[in-house]
């Protein structure tokens, strides 16, 4: 099944594969483009020609039967790419209609050159009339978006928004040049109207806004083209300028390519304690435990309420269960501290609740992890809500220190969804989603460890190393209860095995989680609606034991 996912990927050269695994700021690229062109002994107009031609090749291969292309050009270099596409489409025998936005300033030199070349082959254009209804030829069967580029911040101007909303409502395929108009290339924020593209062709490097935030709803399928700049982009100084890693399907082979030693035994494969399952929330720890066992942890023990011991052992007899009966805070904490001595990895949160049981579990976990800095501590769900209370003096946090004594835990992993992140940062969910990369950095600083910020385009950030990754796997079917509990188990089980450092363990766990969901969705064309969290667990062994790809398969890209 994993190989079938790989088979859907496009062919890429070795250096292109390197570039597809990294992400650069759009602002950095705009500043670097003159040097990039100079490295090829060409000017920026020639670089624009390469971009337009690359986009035309992508779109024409995707839409071989579309005969009337509508190309919308703005007043910047994105519009210049549109003129190049228009020229190539016309030369290929397509009917081409070019509509341009009115602009008070002259076009940039490169865009003006592309416009001149379009007109030189007999091309024409029509300037749109702001406020007037948009009149389009009835037989248009492909719309090419070249309105706005990577420099946009905030909502488009009203005249652009009107056009964007109009074309989004048409039953015609839409493709975007470099980035859908209205999408923030740095953050993935959509502050106003944004083109909903079926496909996007982007150039030279991947930008963060194409992979996270609201991007998944607007980019469609992403196609990356390096424009012949692979050697220049992979030079050490450019690689050091990369903003973050992109973690995707091919990285499965990097994370899990080393086989387990034939001399391994359960004691060497890690001892995990999972704490959760307060009264009324027993299913969460069950799913976490099953995921932890399935991903390869040597020994897994669950601390939960007595009523969940039998169901858990029935469903997952490989796990051990310790029933926590007392409701007295001090006794709870002491019982948990004693149990934690056995473990090499702790995970606290699934079904934890925010009462005395949860408070005691979090206090004990933080105390133990502060003393045993070599152990990994995973915090999720109500453990994060309780942590937020301590940070901001709410819900009993004052009694627990109100954030005054939070330890620095470099090996900790916190896994908030946007709502939990907002509580931890004392802000609105919209503030988290406005810039997910910045939010992840702030979240990781709380305990000085690694943050996994959930959501489309999961962000992983390590505070101590300042490393960041965007995990490009998973789908909308993961919007269901229990998914986070499965992730917690995966992270704890992987951390216990000590295959990688905490940052890479977190990336690997998020990748396994997302790829498992993609496998479920791809099976027999099932789709994303109605995926259950427990279904992911059964795909995990296929991922973590995936054979390395053949040399031919290694040339395939797991994404754009």
Swiss-Prot record:
UniProt KW Lyase keyword: yes
ADP-dependent (S)-NAD(P)H-hydrate dehydratase: annotated segments: 249-560
Binding annotation for (6S)-NADPHX 2: 351, 485
Residues of the YjeF C-terminal domain: 249-547
NAD(P)H-hydrate epimerase, as annotated region: 1-241
Binding residues for (6S)-NADPHX 1: 160, 178
This protein's UniProt keywords: ATP-binding, Isomerase, Lyase, Metal-binding, Multifunctional enzyme, NAD, NADP, Nucleotide-binding, Potassium
Region (NADPHX 2), start-end ranges: 417-423
Stretch list, region NADPHX 1: 77-81, 149-155
Alphabetical list of CDD domains matching this protein: YXKO-related
Catalytic activity: (6S)-NADHX + ADP = AMP + phosphate + NADH + H(+); (6S)-NADPHX + ADP = AMP + phosphate + NADPH + H(+); (6R)-NADHX = (6S)-NADHX; (6R)-NADPHX = (6S)-NADPHX
Pfam families: Carb_kinase, YjeF_N
Enzyme Commission identifier(s): 4.2.1.136, 5.1.99.6
InterPro entries (UniProt xref): Carbohydrate_kinase_pred_CS, CARKD, Nnr, Ribokinase-like, YjeF_N_dom, YjeF_N_dom_sf
Cofactor binding, per record: Binds 1 potassium ion per subunit.
CC cofactor: K(+)
GO term, biological process aspect, one: metabolite repair
List of residues binding ADP: 454-458, 475-484
Stretches assigned to the YjeF N-terminal domain: 29-235
Record has Isomerase as a keyword: yes
Record-linked PANTHER family: ATP-DEPENDENT (S)-NAD(P)H-HYDRATE DEHYDRATASE (PTHR12592:SF0), ATP-DEPENDENT (S)-NAD(P)H-HYDRATE DEHYDRATASE FAMILY MEMBER (PTHR12592)
Family: In the N-terminal section; belongs to the NnrE/AIBP family.
Function: Bifunctional enzyme that catalyzes the epimerization of the S- and R-forms of NAD(P)HX and the dehydration of the S-form of NAD(P)HX at the expense of ADP, which is converted to AMP. This allows the repair of both epimers of NAD(P)HX, a damaged form of NAD(P)H that is a result of enzymatic or heat-dependent hydration.
Name of protein: Bifunctional NAD(P)H-hydrate repair enzyme
């Amino acid at each position: 099944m994993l190989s079938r996912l790989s088979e859907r990927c496009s062919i890429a050269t070795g250096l292109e594969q390197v570039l597809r695994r990294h992400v650069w700021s759009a602002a950095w690229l705009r500043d670097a483009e003159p040097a990039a062109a100079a490295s090829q002994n060409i000017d920026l107009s020639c670089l624009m020609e390469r971009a337009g031609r690359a986009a035309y090749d992508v779109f024409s291969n995707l839409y071989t039967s579309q005969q009337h292309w509508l190309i919308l050009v703005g007043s910047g270099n994105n519009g210049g790419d549109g003129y190049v596409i228009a020229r190539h489409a016309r030369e290929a025998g397509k009917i081409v209609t070019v509509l341009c936005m009115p602009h008070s300033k002259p076009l940039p030199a490169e865009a003006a050159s592309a416009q001149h070349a379009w007109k030189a082959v007999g091309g024409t254009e029509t300037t749109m009339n702001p406020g007037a209804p948009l009149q389009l030829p009835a037989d248009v069967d492909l719309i090419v978006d070249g309105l706005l580029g990577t420099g946009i911040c905030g909502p488009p101007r009203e005249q652009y928004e009107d056009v964007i909303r109009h074309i989004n409502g048409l039953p015609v395929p839409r493709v975007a040049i470099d980035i859908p108009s209205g999408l923030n290339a740095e953050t993935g924020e959509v502050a106003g109207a944004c083109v909903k593209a079926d496909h996007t062709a982007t150039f030279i490097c991947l930008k963060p806004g194409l992979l996270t935030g609201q991007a998944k709803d607007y980019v469609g399928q992403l196609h990356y083209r390096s424009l012949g700049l692979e050697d220049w982009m992979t030079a050490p100084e450019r690689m050091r300028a990369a903003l973050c890693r992109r973690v995707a399907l091919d990285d499965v082979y990097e994370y899990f390519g080393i086989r387990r030693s034939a001399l391994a035994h359960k004691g060497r494969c890690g001892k995990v304690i999972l704490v959760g399952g307060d009264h009324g929330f027993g299913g969460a720890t069950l799913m976490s435990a099953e995921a932890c066992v399935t991903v390869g942890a040597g020994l897994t023990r669950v601390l939960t309420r007595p009523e969940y011991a039998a169901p858990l052992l029935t469903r997952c007899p490989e796990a051990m269960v310790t029933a926590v009966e007392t409701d007295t805070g001090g006794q709870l904490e002491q019982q948990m501290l004693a149990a934690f001595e056995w473990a090499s990895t702790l995970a606290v949160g699934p079904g934890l609740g925010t009462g005395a049981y949860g408070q005691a579990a979090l206090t004990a976990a933080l105390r133990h992890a502060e003393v045993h800095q070599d152990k990994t501590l995973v915090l999720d769900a109500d453990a994060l809500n309780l942590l937020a209370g301590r940070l901001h003096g709410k819900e009993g946090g004052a009694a627990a220190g109100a954030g005054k004594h939070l330890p620095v835990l470099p090996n900790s992993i916190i896994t908030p969804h946007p709502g939990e992140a907002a509580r931890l940062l004392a802000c609105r969910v919209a503030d988290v989603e406005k810039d997910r990369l910045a939010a992840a950095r702030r979240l990781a600083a709380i305990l000085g460890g690694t943050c996994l910020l959930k959501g489309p385009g999961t962000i992983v950030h390590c505070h101590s190393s300042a490393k960041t990754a965007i995990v490009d796997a998973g789908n909308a079917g993961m919007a269901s209860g229990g998914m986070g509990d499965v992730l917690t188990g995966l992270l704890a089980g992987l951390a216990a095995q000590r295959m990688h450092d905490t940052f890479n363990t977190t990336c690997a766990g998020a990748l396994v989680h997302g790829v498992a969901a993609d496998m479920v969705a791809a099976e027999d064309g099932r789709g994303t609606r109605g995926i259950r969290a427990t279904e992911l667990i059964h795909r995990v062994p296929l991922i973590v034991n995936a054979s390395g790809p053949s040399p031919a398969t290694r040339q395939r890209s797991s994404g754009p």
